[in-house]
Curated annotation (Swiss-Prot):
It catalyses: (2R)-3-phosphoglycerate + ATP = (2R)-3-phospho-glyceroyl phosphate + ADP. One of its GO terms (biological process) is glycolytic process. InterPro entries: Phosphoglycerate_kinase, Phosphoglycerate_kinase_CS, Phosphoglycerate_kinase_N, Phosphoglycerate_kinase_sf. The keyword DNA-binding does not apply. Keywords: ATP-binding, Cytoplasm, Glycolysis, Kinase, Nucleotide-binding, Transferase. This is Phosphoglycerate kinase. Gene3D superfamilies: Phosphoglycerate kinase, N-terminal domain (3.40.50.1260).
Length: 391
């Protein structure tokens, strides 16, 4: 991937517009998890240290496009950014007509999704954004898979377009994990539905040595292996597809192992007692809510032997401690492994936080959908735009 990097450009005295991914959880007007904001700090500080006037933009939530709604305002993000940077970050509501921040200052534009045409990558809006800056920096890996005005269109018309520190680091890490991995390559894909990750599973089954599936996804594979899943979440219409994926992985010399034991409950509830069962002993009224201890041990062995680990999604309902042991044990196995490890996806990040292993994962991706699309082998529109502006 050839693209301009922010670090290659003289930013002194320049108006620098940075697209970040500040789509963070907010409650009662306060940011409840600032991981994505912290991840952007090196890029912002680099621009400030280089003598730029810094303008930041992001989306937050899913407001009705073209309409201001206070619940989706970027104000809580501006407040948290001010605290983290140790300097004022001014929230600017009306900026399309022009914004002229002073060198050394930071402004945060109001939610880009309040602008009509943002999601459709409207050319007029993209040109308005481009006119605000001398240098456009795309730093939001989490939205790199969307061709929108603030992530794609603006970069086509800005005088200079480049990748920020975070985006460049993301792309370098993902390239290392998937394009030239140290073997064995082990991928962990969790989540509730095969349907939402079918392309990822298909793509990974072609390249990995072991593809560990967890969550509701695993239930469909358990069913495909001929076992009962009781009243667990699974997709009947994708059982044949799961079987095909297992056979395809085997044909390539890899495997998609099926759990040998699981942790079940009768209801999906925080107070529900957990019971370990062999995968052959699932009752009609059981719900599979985690992988069992023997399965965890086997999967941890795969991870221990790995040269590269890609982790996307928990393997159980880790929000409930009694159904979180599988995710905890695999997380610790990754943390203790000598492999190059990359993890991504919202639930994965929450699990990493819960078990306190962030500093022992080689690289934590800030992307959810973008991380998945990269795993699928798709070209991300924002990256394609940066490559086209590399000259």
């Amino acid at each position: 991937m050839a693209f301009k990097r922010m670090t290659d450009i003289d930013l002194a005295g320049k108006r620098v517009l940075i697209r970040e991914d500040f789509n963070v959880p907010v409650k009662d007007g306060r940011v409840t998890s600032d991981a994505r904001i912290r991840a952007a700090l090196p890029t912002i500080r680099h621009a400030l240290d280089a003598g730029a006037a810094v303008m930041l933009m992001s989306h937050l939530g899913r407001p009705t496009e073209g309409e201001y709604a206070e619940e989706f305002s970027m104000k809580p993000v501006a407040d948290r950014l001010s605290e983290l940077l140790g300097q004022p970050v001014t929230l600017v509501k009306d900026y399309l007509g022009g914004a002229d921040p002073a060198v050394g200052s930071v402004v945060l534009f109001e939610n880009v999704r309040f602008n009509k045409g943002e999601k459709k990558d409207d050319e007029v809006l993209a040109r308005q954004l481009a006119a605000l800056c001398d240098v456009y920096v795309m730093d939001a890996f989490g939205t790199a898979h969307r061709a929108e005005a603030s992530t794609h269109g603006v970069g086509k018309y800005a005088p200079t377009a480049c990748a920020g520190l975070l985006l460049a680091t993301e792309l370098d890490a993902l390239g290392r994990a998937l394009h030239d991995p140290a073997r064995p390559l082990v991928a962990i894909v969790g989540g509730s539905k095969v349907s939402t990750k079918l392309t990822v599973l298909d793509s990974l089954s072609q390249v990995v040595d072991q593809l560990i599936v967890g969550g509701g996804i695993a239930n469909t594979f358990i069913k495909a292996a001929g076992f009962n899943v009781g009243k667990s979440l699974y997709e009947e219409d994708l059982v044949a597809e799961a079987r095909r994926l297992m056979e395809a992985a085997k044909a390539k010399g890899g495997e998609i192992p099926v759990p040998v034991d699981v942790v079940v409950g009768k209801r999906f509830d925080a107070a529900e007692p957990a019971m370990v069962k062999s995968v052959a002993d699932i009752a009609e009224d059981d719900m599979i809510l985690d992988i069992g201890p023997e399965t965890s041990r086997r999967y941890a062995e795969f991870i221990g032997r790995a040269g590269t680990v890609v982790w996307n999604g928990p393997v159980g309902v880790f929000e409930f401690d009694q159904f979180g042991e599988g995710t905890r044990r695999l997380g610790l196995a990754i943390a203790e492994s000598h492999a190059f490890s990359i993890a991504g996806g919202g639930d994965t990040l929450a699990a990493i936080d819960k078990y306190g292993i962030a500093d022992r994962i080689s690289y934590i991706s800030t992307g959810g959908g973008a991380f998945l699309e990269f795993l699928e082998g798709k070209q991300l529109p924002a990256v394609a735009m940066l490559e086209s502006r590399a000259d």
